[in-house]
């Protein structure tokens, strides 16, 4: 269950008592974090400074950052289960996964489900299935456990309560009783003055007696973080270089806990990253401004900051942020369309990263070895569907036919082309289409084209005009004559392939044709197409189709079509 504000009322009343008597302030000792590797990262035990002096001084940003060279790399992917896994999220997961693989570290899966209204376990399961399809297996997560769990934010309420207590006790957080109407009015006033709409600190230094009275009346309140005056936050982003903010001018005192008692996103993330020992936070640039709030929280709790790497957004071909209007955007959609997980990973890895060469096709092992966050670029990447399909085709052609057959077989069975997903027919079809596939689903139309016979359509097309005018009827007549005389090799014979090649060679001599003038008319006559896989292998496919009860236009039926066409040429 999520932390509820009412559980903190006794603690806050005690804090109000302390506010009445500053000399009685009892500072808390910062906690020690235990990491899954068994290494304990002790946070400095020095007492926190008094808030009065802290707020008055201009502070240099000297917060400690985790030394990646001296600690086991721990990265995380933290999706919100409110929909499907978007390709942008998949790329973030991939970059984290590859960083862990390259460094011999751990890849953590954390579910950020604090939005109770929109989050669902169904969405979570869908995302986990998509990650597994991509081969991005995590080392710790909600279904695997680990030493720093729970791994769902909705189950980490006690942890957030403990950290919130520490912030309040140390003077880093305070209750705000402003109503929504008052906050709206403040925003409007700021906008009318052309000022940034920030909280004006109404309750920041409120009289403790007034705070206590409000609480005893049961007036709803939020907790706000007390942003230090003059505080400058600086991070050395691994992608974007140095990024700095004037904290007070940028965010003002922000909410930590809502009036419902539910912690806000940035508070949960900061606490989780620290408690889980995350060394590198790799995420999209839209989270860059969140780093300011998270660093303030981490600094207040005296936790070391992780290394940040904010990757540019993925854009559509019109240079706007990739969205549904650009077509498929979820991993599940690409999976259904027939893309390979290896191709998806290869393509997504190149959306913002390269290995410093012109190399584009990577195996999974090569990606594990080559990936380096320092080679992720600042500029936005454009999602090019044509390039993705080309890359998928490269990966399909790199498969052993034994790996391709199950994919093609299940695809053809699902489409109703055949019933046996692993028989000789599918083996033959997979072998024939492998060289021209971009998607596994392309096997459906390409196989159906080979089983069908579009002779009449092709012969009347402009594409075939030159071929027909070059004595095509003479070639057709020779084919028909040989078939009727039993001189054309039968596709079902064991020696069909060499016999068919020998037969074509003999036809070339008899008709004084060779090369394209020989093969192109024979292809059109026997397959009904101007291009395609090996002619003889296509005829063998027809025989296998007939044996397995797969609908096709047989060789005999094709010969009858040729005879009918010849009759029109007399």
Language-model features and meaning:
Residues 1-38:
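N-terminal chloroplast transit peptides
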Residues 26, 40-60, 68:
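N-terminal mitochondrial targeting presequences
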Residues 54-192, 289-303:
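N-terminal Rossmann-like or analogous alpha/beta NTP/dinucleotide-binding catalytic cores
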Residues 75-81, 108-113, 276-281, 329, ...:
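Glycine- and acidic
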Residues 174-310, 316-322, 330, 355, ...:
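Active-site cores that bind ATP or allylic diphosphates and position pyrophosphate for catalysis
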Residues 289, 302-456, 527-570:
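Catalytic adenosine-cofactor/nucleotide-binding cores of aminoacyl-tRNA synthetases and other
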Residues 423-497:
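Aromatic-anchored, charged helix-turn/loop surface patch used as a conserved interaction hotspot
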Residues 522:
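Hydrophobic, well-ordered secondary-structure elements that form the walls
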């Amino acid at each position: 269950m999520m932390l509820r504000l009412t559980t903190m009322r006794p603690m806050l009343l005690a804090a109000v008592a302390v506010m009445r008597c500053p000399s009685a302030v009892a500072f808390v000792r910062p906690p020690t974090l235990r990491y899954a590797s068994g290494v304990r990262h002790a946070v400095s035990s020095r007492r926190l400074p008094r808030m009065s002096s802290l707020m008055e001084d201009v502070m240099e940003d000297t917060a400690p950052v985790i030394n990646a060279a001296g600690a086991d790399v721990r990265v995380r992917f933290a999706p919100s289960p409110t929909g499907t896994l978007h390709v942008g999220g998949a790329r973030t997961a991939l970059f984290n996964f590859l960083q862990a693989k390259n460094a011999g570290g751990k890849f953590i899966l954390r579910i950020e489900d604090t939005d109770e209204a929109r989050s669902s376990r169904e969405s979570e399961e869908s995302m986990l299935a998509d990650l597994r399809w991509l081969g991005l297996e995590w080392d710790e997560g909600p279904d695997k456990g680990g030493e720093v769990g729970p791994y769902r934010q909705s189950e980490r309420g006690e942890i957030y309560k403990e950290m919130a207590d520490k912030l309040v006790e140390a003077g880093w957080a305070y209750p705000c009783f402003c109503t929504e109407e008052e906050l709206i009015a403040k925003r409007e006033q700021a906008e009318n003055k052309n000022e940034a709409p920030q909280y004006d600190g109404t309750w920041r230094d409120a009289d403790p007696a007034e705070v206590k009275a409000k609480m005893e009346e049961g007036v709803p309140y939020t907790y706000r973080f007390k942003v230090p005056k003059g505080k400058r936050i600086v991070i050395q982003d691994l992608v974007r270089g140095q990024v700095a903010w004037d904290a007070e001018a940028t965010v003002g005192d922000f909410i930590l806990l809502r009036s419902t008692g539910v912690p806000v996103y940035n508070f949960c993330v900061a606490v989780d990253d620290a408690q889980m020992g995350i060394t590198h936070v790799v995420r999209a640039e839209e989270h860059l401004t969140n780093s300011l709030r998270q660093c303030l929280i981490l600094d207040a709790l005296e936790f070391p900051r992780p290394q940040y790497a904010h990757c540019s957004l993925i854009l559509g071909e019109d240079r706007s942020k990739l969205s549904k209007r650009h077509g498929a955007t979820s991993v599940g959609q690409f999976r259904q369309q027939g893309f390979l997980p290896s191709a998806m990973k290869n393509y997504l890895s190149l959306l913002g990263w390269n290995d410093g060469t012109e190399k584009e096709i990577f195996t999974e092992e090569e990606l594990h070895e080559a990936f380096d966050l320092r080679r992720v670029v600042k500029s936005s990447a454009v999602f090019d569907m044509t390039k993705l399909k080309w890359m998928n085709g490269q990966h399909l052609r790199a498969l052993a036919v034994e790996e391709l057959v199950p994919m093609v077989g299940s695809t053809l069975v699902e489409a109703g082309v055949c019933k046996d997903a692993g028989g000789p027919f599918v083996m033959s079809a997979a072998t024939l289409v492998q060289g021209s596939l971009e998607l596994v689903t392309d096997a459906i139309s390409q196989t159906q084209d080979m089983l069908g016979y579009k002779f009449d359509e092709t012969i009347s097309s402009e594409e075939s005009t030159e071929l027909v005018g070059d004595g095509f009827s003479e070639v057709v007549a020779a084919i028909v004559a040989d078939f009727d005389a039993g001189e054309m090799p039968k596709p079902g014979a064991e020696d069909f392939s060499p016999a068919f090649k020998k037969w074509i060679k003999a036809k070339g001599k008899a008709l004084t044709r060779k090369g394209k003038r020989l093969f192109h008319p024979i292809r059109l006559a026997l397959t009904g197409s101007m291009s395609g896989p090996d002619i003889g292998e296509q005829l063998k496919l027809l025989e296998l189709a007939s044996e397995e009860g797969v609908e096709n236009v047989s060789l005999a039926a094709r010969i009858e079509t040729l005879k009918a066409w010849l009759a029109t040429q007399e």
